[in-house]
């Protein structure tokens, strides 16, 4: 709320920024700037990923409520108090706009990473995993630059002597997780005996656990994800969820997954050409979505991409 003068025998005059009466009225997340920053309800899986940003917005809005509850009528001898009151109002308005923008960027990233046609959720790391990731990230200098892409047919790798190797090992551990019969990109785990789209005249065999011999494949391997612009600038939580994003998982047969390794499907031989072309298109689509999510997460952190 904007401060006002109180004059004896005269009407009270509102300050120049009386519009803050509207801007500083916190209701729900979307109401602060409905024209440009309509932040919707925070639902799972975004709830965990964006929880700290939602809390930051709520904290600013609590300060706004406290500000608006403060007496705001000043007489002519209180010019300094009026100026301080209005300066605080302006600062809170700016803080709220920043908090809304950060939360919206996070929600947008979560929407990209957690596809509607997957039964796998985005989950934050454990505290122990978070600490390991932070320690690994700290080993990467600000002057480190990713290497050039490998030749077609060669694997994406993170050499043992490379600064991000510890980060790669931490992100690769237990990844992909055991997904059982999860639905990935709209496809249930293939049944035993189902046709293998990667190879003509082959079917999914039976694995030792009785399920089909199918693997949850990273469409874009973790080694390549680490080299995406801005990835190593993400927080440990954000790096963790990007490398485990439902968007980036698909079912492949054991044979196809073993043949693909950590390279592009373009380098595979002996596979169905139509399937290969579709996979190359899927890789291009997925890497664009991952980069978009990384950029949005960096924005939510307030981190300019190097």
Features from the language model and the residues they span:
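Secretory targeting and sorting signals
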Residues: 1-34
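Charged, low-complexity interaction regions
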Residues: 68-82
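Amphipathic alpha-helical coiled-coil segments
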Residues: 63, 87-116
